[in-house]
Amino acid sequence: MYIENINGPEDVKKLSDDQLNVLAEEIRKALLEKLSKHGGHFGPNFGMVEATIAMHYVFESPKDKIVYDVSHQSYPHKMLTGRKDAFLYEEHYDDVSGYSNPEESEHDHFTIGHTSTSISLALGLAKARDLKEENGNVIAVIGDGSLSGGEALEGLDYAAELGGNLIIVVNDNDMSIAENHGGLYDNLKELRDTNGEAECNLFKAMGLDYIYVKEGNKVADLIEAFKRVKDTKKAVVVHINTQKGKGYKLAEEHKEEWHYCAPFDVETGNPLDSFDGEDFSSVTAQYLLKKMKEDKKVVAITSATPTVMGFTEDKRKEAGKQFIDVGIAEETAMAMAAGIAAGGGKPVYGVYSTFVQRTYDQITQDLCIDSNAATIVTFWGSVYGMNDVTHLGLQDIPMMSNIPNLVYLAPTTKEEYLAMLDWSIDQDQYPVAIKLPGGEMISDSKKITKDFSQLNKYEVTEKGSKVAVIGLGTFYNMGCEVAKEVEEKTGTKATVINPYYITGIDEILLEDLKKDHDVVITLEDGFLEGGFGEKIARFYGDSDVKVLNYGVKKELLDRYDVTELLEKNHLTVQQIVGDLKF
């Protein structure tokens, strides 16, 4: 196999056209083998094989710098830059991350996982090159809907003004994670339909040079195009028309489902571990569709991740105009939600915890200053969520709980969540966010009668003395286990509290605990610093009550093991009980 002899881009350059085509098939075969066992981003990488080969054939990486947007489509790049073993041999599968990583290779220039950043990052590299009076090409590779992100458009807007070498490869596969949304994609289609000759051209309108490659999965055509723009003295867009998922029929035919995959059977495409039960995503879609039928003012909003809310293609069609996908544009999603709320609508914006930080300003300015009553549902904000350093869901508690006027809620069960969601949608006084628990969804069938408009009212679920355990959201059940262990080991029945609210404290309840409690334990699923527990500790600061805060130490974790992380942060029942001194 040719791939076995590729130790760097210099080896790619030695191959003939026919050999490069064989190399492309070998890369796909290796990707299929690994992803079927390991999981990962499927469609984006299968569509970028030829373009990656062509770039490394023409350009001189790492002197010529290639920046992949999101970098979820960088697997072929890794295979051609000295990391092939991580794709050829199962025992080495975990040697590399799923994104670009400078610690792995000099051919990776940034740790990237969020979208729409590549052009701006490339602009910076190009400017640094020019300041140092050096030579070299800087290439930004962007696709999978990333052009709909505001930062990408900002970068395009400035690129022509830069005045030096910058090559922007637009990987146009007519898809985001799901279908693309936004007017600019109509222009991309027009360019595809006219072989790049359409009079209306977004890129030319921004002052950029432009060439179109119709066959974006043909190595020879791509090599020719990249040779044309190599060493250009200005910014140029190379628009390549590729097929997402190319080489695996199921991925070609079902692009949304095969954007990312869990381990699967190659013959059938069926996942090796199937899950047919309810989760917070499916429950959210089911509830909202029912609510939409009852109230035409209810609208669900996503920023290119519809299935996180459970809105698969059939459910999006069922919702019709009451479902909005703004593309990869969290800022617009949040500001639009604020506008809908201000206009009398009832918006619900579902978003991964890791992407909330992309719209922090809109939450503060557009939502909370005027108290526009929109609902934000944050998914996967947990140690049990995504564990890549670029996608951690551990920051939303300190980030969101300190925004004035925002009510941030933490349910522990399906029933609590739906009660909170129902209240939030129908009330018109507060912007509300709901942090969904991590791990498997718990359903206890309890009827929830709590009035959530009585803000910051905690609930004592078990009354005891001496020790009080406040378990927030995901970690409420751990709090119950801590209380049980305390009673078994010491005979002391501990108080257990479900706080519900992240953004405020129940001063009356906390004051009452002073009467017969010596220790208050707080448990939270996220970073400790600036978080929930510190609010409790601050309340007891001048009293004799000792407060023990448990959560995750603030650090940039990458591909952590959950069990090890919990133990490292003293977040096991045995460790917590062991910290108590009677």
Spans of features found by a protein language model:
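Peripheral docking tails and interdomain loops at the edges
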Residues: 269-274, 385-387, 407, 527, ...
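A glycine-rich helix N-cap at a beta->alpha junction
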Residues: 86-96, 161-175, 368-380
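Cofactor-binding active-site loop characterized by glycine-rich and histidine/acidic residues
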Residues: 41-162, 298, 303, 312-313, ...
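Glycine/charged-rich beta-loop-alpha catalytic/anionic-binding loops adjacent to active sites
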Residues: 29-36, 95-111, 133-139, 312-327, ...
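Non-catalytic terminal/interface segments that mediate subunit docking, oligomerization
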Residues: 65, 248-357, 362-372, 465, ...
